UniProtKB/Swiss-Prot annotation:
Basic and acidic residues: bias regions: 337-347, 388-407
Signal peptide per UniProt: none
Pfam families, per database record: GAT, VHS
Role: Might contribute to the loading of the ESCRT machinery.
Protein name: TOM1-like protein 1
UniProt record similarity statement: Belongs to the TOM1 family.
Length: 407
């Protein structure tokens, strides 16, 4: 009895020990995660965070487009870390001040429309999760909620451009499955990821913006796209043409298998695709400059042809199948045709063949044999001199008696 009680107490103590260890591990993990978040929120801002704060400060009545586009240039020129910048925008979206949230969403939209790698950073930093939380938060103002919904809808429906990042489409479909109603998108939201430039210059655009500030509860700003200078355009065209020439040379001069597996080919293909994106943006921002538009379209056509040739060579080759040579149908003449009959009559046949063919008829064959003997000195296809039954005396007597051919 005492031993059983001790065993139960020991087992219960072990369970308490194991349970306490698990609880301790969970608490440690939770504290570590919380300390990381607290450190992230309260540590001193780095230079990138300061840039984001200046662009989304609550003192701004409207987006500072010059600053936003300058930030995009800094990302493209890699003078600032794009990961830290997107992370800083995410922090501003998480804040509860409506104006800061809205300006952060506008800055985010500007970056993804003007920076090629911004979408990858948005997906990696889980910015969409914070946007969904903003949408689900009942304290979020309607304007900010609609802005987040419009961005998610535009990205979710851009399956061709963002097919390599499925998180955008999945987030959009998840909200639709929950019955979330998306607001009607304006023309700017319906445009492609890289929106065309407006016909009005930037100063006039900013001058018109205060008129829209007084519109009720649905403030929308057009996101401008940075245009290219003459030097940038020339450099982009030169890079594109050099890439086209090199890739075409590699594909034409090397064996197909070696060309496709070569690292140089892969690098050139990537460079051509990057150049194609840049040239397409030049086309979108060309405006009324017909000479620039014409040159950009020609370069884009050359890029498309070269990349299409690479894709065609990269396709798996179909198994070779043996094909029979093509036969030309020829109509055959029936045996009883007049032509066949005339040709048949021109061929001399032996008596045995003639006899067999005509069923062993007699008089006609004898007549032909006699005619052969008179003309050729042969009978039944044999020379009379070589015939063992040949008798010259009988032949002379026969020739005297038969002056004419008997039928």
């Amino acid at each position: 009895m005492g031993d059983n009680l001790m065993d139960k107490v020991t087992a219960f103590g072990e369970r308490l020990k194991i349970g306490g260890s698990e609880v301790s591990n969970k608490i440690s993990a939770g504290v570590s995660s919380m300390s990381f978040k607290v450190k992230e929120l309260f540590q001193g801002p780095n230079p990138t965070d300061k840039i984001v704060e200046d662009a989304t400060t609550e003192n701004l009545e409207e987006p500072d487009w010059d600053m936003n586009l300058e930030i995009c240039d800094m990302i493209n020129q890699e003078t600032i870390n794009s990961v830290e910048l997107i992370r800083g925008i995410k922090k501003r979206i998480m804040m509860k001040q409506p104006r800061i949230q809205y300006l952060a969403l506008v800055l985010l939209e500007t970056c993804v429309k003007n920076c090629e790698k911004a979408f990858s950073e948005v997906a990696a930093e889980r910015v969409l999760d914070e946007m969904v939380k903003l949408i689900d938060d009942p304290q979020t103002v309607v304007n900010n909620r609609n802005k987040a919904l419009m961005l998610i809808e535009a990205w979710g429906e851009s399956t061709s451009e963002l097919r390599y990042l499925p998180v955008f489409e999945e987030t959009y479909k998840s909200l639709k499955a929950r019955g979330i109603r998306f607001p009607g998108r304006d023309n700017e939201s319906l445009a492609p990821i890289f929106t065309p430039a407006r016909s009005t210059p930037a100063p006039e655009l900013n001058a018109d913006l205060p008129q829209h500030v007084h519109e009720p509860a649905h403030i929308q700003y057009d996101v401008p796209v940075r245009s290219f200078t003459a030097e940038q355009t020339k450099e982009a065209f030169d890079i594109a043409r050099n890439s086209i020439e090199l890739l075409s040379t590699v594909l034409s001069s090397s064996p197909q298998h070696d060309a496709l597996q070569d690292d140089l080919t892969t690098t050139l293909v990537q460079q051509c695709r990057q150049s194609q994106t840049t040239v397409q943006r030049i086309i979108e921002t060309a405006g009324e400059n017909e000479a620039l538009l014409f040159e950009a379209l020609n370069v884009n056509d050359e890029l498309v042809k070269t990349l299409s040739k690479y894709e065609e060579m990269n396709k798996p080759s179909a198994p070779l199948t043996s094909h029979e040579p093509a036969m030309i149908p020829v109509a055959e003449e029936p045996d009883d045709s007049p032509i066949h009959g005339r040709e048949e009559s021109l061929v001399r046949k032996s008596s045995g063949v003639r006899g067999g063919f005509h069923g062993g008829g007699g008089s006609g064959d004898d007549m032909m044999d006699d005619l052969d003997e008179m003309i050729f000195g042969k009978k039944n296809g044999c020379d009379s001199s070589t015939n063992p039954d040949h008798d010259p005396k009988k032949e002379q007597s026969s020739s005297k008696n038969d002056d004419l051919i008997r039928f």
